[in-house]
From Swiss-Prot:
GO terms for biological process: translation. The gene is rpsB. InterPro entries: Ribosomal_uS2, Ribosomal_uS2_bac/mit/plastid, Ribosomal_uS2_CS, Ribosomal_uS2_flav_dom_sf. Residues 241-270 are annotated as: Disordered. It comes from Mycoplasma capricolum subsp. capricolum (strain California kid / ATCC 27343 / NCTC 10154). Pfam families: Ribosomal_S2. Belongs to the universal ribosomal protein uS2 family. Residues 251-270 have a biased composition (Polar residues). CDD domains: RPS2 (cd01425). The lineage of its organism: Bacteria, Bacillati, Mycoplasmatota, Mollicutes, Mycoplasmataceae. This is Small ribosomal subunit protein uS2.
Amino acid sequence: MSREITREELSAAGVQYGHQTKRWNPKMKSYIYGVKNKNHIIDLEKTITHLNAAQKLLEFLGSKQQKILFVGTKRSGKNAVKEAALRSGNFYINNRWLGGTLTNLKTILIRIKALWEIEEEEKKGRLSLRTKKEQIKILKEKAKLEKALGGIKQMHKLPAAIVVVDPKGDEIAVKEAKKLNIPVIAICDTNADPDMVDYVIPGNDDLQESVNLIINILVEAYAEGAQIKMNPSVLRTVAPKREPRQINRPVMSSENQAEQQTSVANENVQMTNEPVVQVAEVEKPSEPKAE
């Protein structure tokens, strides 16, 4: 059984911090707790619930020895997806997504074969028999292929699921997976479109600590199902003691604090007239008006 997730660890990683309210996607309103200084605060209870669902899927896929593709091409996810894949024997893409990676896998496999052939030529010493000019050209091609395909060069068939750090930034990857009915698990910040994702995980996708923690929770679930022992993650999962995206703590009188203060993972959330989701006393958001 996958490990229990606590609000405290999610809060320490900064998972709750969403984007500025003006940058939100209204489809994410059911995952939002409130607003703090014009920034949305994500409901961590929803995050835990959806993480639990994703854990169950990955644990099941692991038990069937199915392979997963981790996708994180934005800075906050590059290290997390690579580490997760290497620790669990899965695949990753942390540079630009090549169109057709899933939908045109046959062509991608041809390019992967070219990478293997260059590596084989190096290994057997045949590369050194070529001219310097040829060697330079071949090694440049190898570096290019390794950067684009190094994380999937062992992937000979479609993955059973993909885990995406930013479904908005890696929209092409998500669309390809959906077209092929491959389940999509994704961290959805408040500016994301959850309709494109099968397993929505509401959370901050910009803080490395937030991404590291969520990806680590997911890969641990896979390892649990696959019954493999992984090395501990070396990535940090506790955010610096500052609030990301310049979210400043609201200054309120003690009287107003008593009336307005609510807690989201020990953080003061300022309730404003910005659209927010009803959670306890939080006002429901109004639908966006047509222009």
